[in-house]
Amino acid sequence: MAPKKKATTAAQKDRSKALDLAMAQIEKDFGKGAIMRLGDENRPPISAIPSGNIAINVALGIGGFPRGRVVEIYGPESSGKTTVALHAIAEAQKGGGIAAFIDAEHALDPEYAKALGVDTDALLVSQPDTGEQALEIADMLVRSGAIDMVVIDSVAALTPKAEIDGEMGDSHVGLQARLMSQALRKMTSALYQTGTTAIFINQLREKIGVMFGSPETTTGGKALKFYASVRCDIRRIQALKDGQDVVGNRTRLKIVKNKVSPPFKIAEFDILYGEGISREGSILDLGVDAGIIKKSGSWFTYEGEQLGQGKEKARDFLKSNPELAEQLDDRIMQELKVGPYAKAKDEPIADEDQPIDVVPNFDDQDVEPQN
């Protein structure tokens, strides 16, 4: 038995030596760090850009949208997709970062963006003519390494040049899907290397002839579903009224895919017309759920201090006391162990084997039916 064991040990040494030589050659040809053992480098946890709302930060699991990754936000019309993206831009700017907005829909309202806290003077905006131009501009900005976030609004509006130059009614099967696939292949590596977050806003379509399950699908083919580290499904669930007037929407955001934290978490929050997402409303909701804010009848109380009777008055009180709102935000994040307060968890993080969609038929086809 001894000679066999020695032979095995010698073979292992030869393999190890051959591997070291191969790794040395790879580093010589492609640069240091081109290949390494995963345990050799002490990687910091994935950093994030806050979303601007604590409910979304908690649902995302790491305190915001991950840096260096692709994020997709999709939902029906007027559900709050652009509002969520603009809040994220405002947070990136507050942290000293630079953000870009690729307005393929040509529908960005500067006044609304300013009301949400976006520094419109510093925001980079492009209104491209074609889908190729939009994605090329986004890629160049990412590769510059100078920006922290780029938002593309929306994938559905990224019209291929061949379609624009062609006649109305011409069939252009799969052009947009191929365009998105090529762009994401190019951008993914650059996003990771520069730590830039790319948010793609997407629209919903309905498939023809679906008998079972949801007929809903997103535009742009399958590529974005695979490349996105986070996919958010956003929907209006209730109208908010002040008397007879509708003043906003109660909105639900579901994390249907998450490669950086456990998926399928849900955030509910209020979007007020002209103001955007109510930060104070989410603080009250999560504070009560976490037991930090006490609710007795209609009164909200924090450490013996009355915040107000009814949610509206308590929200107004927190608006007029931003230091207290910030303190509560931080304490809730600490209590729920989210973001900088997250502890190392034993459970594996979802990755390539994770289901891409909650609704399986989202991935049935790469190209939308031509009407």
From Swiss-Prot:
The gene is recA. Can catalyze the hydrolysis of ATP in the presence of single-stranded DNA, the ATP-dependent uptake of single-stranded DNA by duplex DNA, and the ATP-dependent hybridization of homologous single-stranded DNAs. It interacts with LexA causing its activation and leading to its autocatalytic cleavage. This is Protein RecA. GO terms for cellular component: cytosol. Belongs to the RecA family. ATP binds at residues 75-82. It is found in: Cytoplasm. It comes from Corynebacterium urealyticum (strain ATCC 43042 / DSM 7109). Coiled coil: none annotated.
